[in-house]
A protein has these predicted regions:
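12-transmembrane solute porter fold
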Residues: 1-148, 167-192
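Intrinsic disorder in cytosolic terminal tails and internal cytosolic loops
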Residues: 157-160, 190-199
Length: 199
């Protein structure tokens, strides 16, 4: 689910930064690079924290952070300061970094050592499937919402009408927020369930 939500943002962000805000491709790229840069720094730290905290707790914290960033994106307009948008991108990278490492640990800890290769393959499959679903679902929701706001079908950014795109963007990122929220609730249930079993 979280890969689906992440790719909603990956599809929307270039349209917002380049078409709606008028940034050059390299400028938009520099801003979006904050996500992987922060994630690279945070992921190993999150991995080391598993010695002190339950992986389920860390993944829940990461998902809560990711859900909050979706709210930030949902409120973005043409007048939103780019430093604020960049902050949300960095916070999203932080949340993803907190989530990824302990989530992989949880997946791998549920299988025997001889099945680790299969589990790793299934984990990669789930990740790639989430990416594909995220791309297809986000574009479907985006252009359906834009078409509704425009009053007729459209499958591209409408020049000179950033308001149409923003309407579609807000709807699309609202869907992404609910996906993140659902993933958070599922993960929280998993954490509480394991705590009950441990007693």
């Amino acid at each position: 689910l979280i890969f689906v939500a992440n790719f909603f943002f990956n599809v929307i962000a270039p349209f917002y930064l380049q078409n709606a805000r008028g940034l050059m491709p390299n400028e938009a790229g520099y801003l979006l690079m904050l996500f992987p840069i922060v994630q690279v720094v945070v992921s190993p730290i999150s991995g080391s924290l598993q010695n002190r905290f339950a992986p389920e707790l860390l993944t829940t914290v990461g998902l809560v952070i990711l859900s909050i960033t979706q709210i930030g994106y949902m409120t973005a307009t043409l007048s939103t300061p780019l430093w604020l948008f960049g902050t949300w991108v960095g916070v999203m990278g932080f949340g993803n970094g907190v989530f990824q490492s302990p989530n992989n640990t949880i997946v791998m800890s549920t299988v025997s050592q001889r099945d680790l290769g299969v589990a790793g393959g299934m984990n990669a499959l789930a990740r790639n499937l989430g990416m594909v679903v995220g791309i297809s679902a986000s574009t479907t929701v985006l252009f359906a919402s834009m078409s509704q706001a425009y009053g007729k079908p459209t499958t591209t950014y409408i020049a000179g009408r950033p308001d149409i795109f923003l309407a579609g963007m807000h709807t699309t990122l609202t869907v992404a927020f609910f996906i993140c929220a659902l993933a958070t609730l599922i993960n929280l249930w998993r954490y509480l369930h394991r705590r009950v079993q441990a007693k």
